[in-house]
């Protein structure tokens, strides 16, 4: 048997076919160990051959062996790797591990020259090297790794003292095994309570192999429990206390060694393989070799136990050289080497690899908490802190965990909630910020600032809210600071905020007015009084209750200023008026002082003549009242209220806004648009009492008198309540739309009947051109005196002077002058007069290239830019006569120009030049100059002149070409003018005064303008849009046109830039004749 044991490896060289090797293993497996007993190792070996086909063994042996390795080492190495792949899931990982292990095992065995020694001797060397390898791994890495992970390049370190003792013990056991080649265990031991107990019955006695199986099962159970807990929560792996504690390992080894020494030579009974077969190197070795292996692994276990106590080694259990075997399926991800349940020591070696890999997440978790970056599993963003990572995850989850306790507002971030809570803090303190141009209200001043950007055409001042601070002064605290006033103003829920637009006429207001409050406060005081007469349905006492917002239609109607639009105005006029309004709105704050100073005069004059004050809106007209009779003033009440009211934009916008109230005024007033006319005409001689609520003029009187009587002399409220109601842009556009509809209907209805017949200033043609809101009486005087004859020019001048006595008069640019034809509004009377000529005068400036006709030269010049030509003559008569000349004038011109492209013919050079500029470059020279007296045709202007001078000398006619520059007569004359200075000098004569196009034809010659040395707009080039102010620049510019057209073909009149190009071009005309006339050009 020993001989067969030594010869068996010869049958398994690496180059032998895998089928033969498998057959040999199967046939002689029972006698492999030289004993007749079938130990669990032998049975396991046979089971491996049955379960795993030869294909797996082929792959393993190809990777693990080479032809040079000793036969003794090849077999255990290949089978050890083969057993690793018991699990199909771990097959690929195990194969990778085999690649690392095989070279190491082979290198350990290659050193042995005696390859024919018994297998146990070679195995001893392998196990000794394995123990050294495990010791080195435990000391170097501080964690258990199987030999698979150690690799062949592991530097061996001296084993510990305890490991060396175990190695010596294992070596002695191996030597005793060699002496007893055949042995059969006679006595069996049973592992019970940490000790090996002898069993009397041989049938039930345990061999060392079976004892190790028991130990393995116990270790497996512990590992399973540990692995289950590892999956649930990451924790540090602790070395197993059973069965390989420091005491149990040594006692087990002692018992096993004693058992081996007492082993008898009689074969023992065969033990069936366990459910999970124990497959390891022990399956191919004797029991002594197995004990040796167990000793080595026990040493590794102790080393791992010691290394686990080190702070840097959170990793698990004892090392072992053994290849991983089938691990009972634990929840943690199986590591590359997990095979069947091995002996206790083997299992301890296997699970270090899984445990090590499972423990890495726990390590990483602890590292993350200590500062390792967090990564978002959705977008992959790496975040440094856990709190930031949680905040980032809200983006993906959409969770808004922060709820405002006062409102439904929710947010994901705490800082957003804090900023939101400030809104409630402002509300609790009564702080509100309201826009003065629209109903927008915000509890944050910054939001109001942002909102004010929407009002691009209105005054944008961040101090609007602060300007309303004087409102608390109305309550009796004029000396409060701005902040205090602001707080009080907001406590009222925004009621005080709107005080600037409408305020009550209570004695508190008036008393505050006398207290020397800021001008803003003065502006607020009279607004409610101006808007509401005492006799009106809306009492002033009711005002404070609603003065937060005056959106009620009755309040709109209360301000009878809406009648200002009773006259006819078109949509365009209204839009222009709004544009003026927006522009003037920005100037309004600067005009506040003017209004305050002007109204004291009103108060003084009104105290003496109350009836007259009903129509007065401007200080000039009010001052003139004392010298004017009541009858003289009465017809102008409606007119003065409309035409003389000074509109500083806000007033105008207020009037526009109040137009919307016309639909609601049926229950409160007579129609405003009609009644003033009747009252002015019928009751002009009757003195109207201020208490009467008859018409528009009376309402205006009430507005102006009552509040002014209450006001002190030093303080006067503004003359109107500006923007008393907030209107948005959309509201204004709707009002304009309604206005346009009403205006269009009434304009068609009343223009024929009323405008020319009534004496009302609203419909007077002259005054209608002026702005209805004009404050300057001088502008209105001519129409007033013509219509009524009651106010003379000296009186109006006196009014202006008196108004200017210490009070600045309103500027003219604040006035508006609408056109009664098209509705366009102008800021100056002169502009309106010039505009009106467009509706009446004849369009005598006609375009010679299209049917367009203009009434002024500027418009025609602007139109001609479309045709790429400009008229530079300053003589309007010449231009008109030249453009409007008809074909009958051909008798005066000896020749005319004809276009070959479209057939256009004209005697005027300017028309022909501008016409040819409309064609493409190639077509611009397809023309001819024809004689009117005969059929002579040429393309050169000089030739036609010579022809006329020789053939038609008797006809004394001046031609346009004689009075025009040759370069302006035709583009081809540029070359002539450049080459002949005489022609250019003769062409500069100003014979007819009709030159329309003026250019300089020679670089040295000076351009001559027909009537002026320099036109209004400078020197303009006829060939392009170039305009300059000096002659030198103009001459330099003309060189561009002269040079580019210097070399012209006399056949096709095409210009070349260089003589060489012209010579080359002329060849195309002379080739058919066979000669080149290049010299004659």
From Swiss-Prot:
A zinc finger (C2H2-type) spans 374-396, 402-424, 433-455, 817-839, 845-867, 897-919, 929-952, 1019-1041, 1047-1069. Residues 1-14 are annotated as: Mediates direct interaction with RBBP4. It is found in: Nucleus; Chromosome, Telomere. Residues 961-978 have a biased composition (Low complexity). There is a cross-link at residue 673 (Glycyl lysine isopeptide (Lys-Gly) (interchain with G-Cter in SUMO1)). Gene3D superfamilies: Classic Zinc Finger (3.30.160.60). Changing residue 11 to A: Decreased interaction with RBBP4. Residues 327-344 have a biased composition (Pro residues). GO terms for molecular function: DNA binding; NuRD complex binding; zinc ion binding. One of its GO terms (biological process) is telomere maintenance. It comes from the Eukaryota. Residues 1-77, 259-278, 307-348, 947-996 are annotated as: Disordered. Keywords: Chromosome, DNA-binding, Isopeptide bond, Metal-binding, Nucleus, Repeat, Telomere, Transcription, Transcription regulation, Ubl conjugation, Zinc, Zinc-finger. PROSITE patterns: ZINC_FINGER_C2H2_1, ZINC_FINGER_C2H2_2. As part of a ribonucleoprotein complex composed at least of HNRNPK, HNRNPL and the circular RNA circZNF827 that nucleates the complex on chromatin, may negatively regulate the transcription of genes involved in neuronal differentiation. Could also recruit the nucleosome remodeling and histone deacetylase/NuRD complex to telomeric regions of chromosomes to regulate chromatin remodeling as part of telomere maintenance. This is Zinc finger protein 827. The lineage of its organism: Eukaryota, Metazoa, Chordata, Craniata, Vertebrata.
